[in-house]
Amino acid sequence: MSNWKELFDTEGIVEESVKEQIEEPAKYYVFLLNDDYTPMDFVVDVLCNFFNKSEEQATDIMLTIHYKGKALCGTYTAEIAETKVEQVVQYAFENQHPLKCVMTKA
């Protein structure tokens, strides 16, 4: 009977196969870009509501955007980054602001 067990004991093989197939998903950075028209308080609102930043964190990021032209809002998987970009762009459009949000591969 030990031959039977040896023939069908694939536990170690399956574990190795699964470990080889699982890899970390690619990460993407999401940035907000500066413009001359979007109010600073709107940018803070976006950072608090879409990126779960505190008021203080959002203000710091907003000032970085204002003075450096862009700032990192977060790092996400591709699907989440795409969703955040779409949500921010749509929200800005609905509120008649030209705020731009982009994603780049990390």
Swiss-Prot record:
Source species, domain of life: Bacteria
One Pfam family, short name: ClpS
GO annotation, biological process: protein catabolic process; proteolysis
Signal peptide (residue range): none
Quaternary structure annotation from Swiss-Prot or TrEMBL: Binds to the N-terminal domain of the chaperone ClpA.
Record function comment: Involved in the modulation of the specificity of the ClpAP-mediated ATP-dependent protein degradation.
Family designation: Belongs to the ClpS family.
NCBIfam families (UniProt xref): PRK00033.1-5
Identification of the protein by name: ATP-dependent Clp protease adapter protein ClpS
Provenance organism: Colwellia psychrerythraea (strain 34H / ATCC BAA-681)
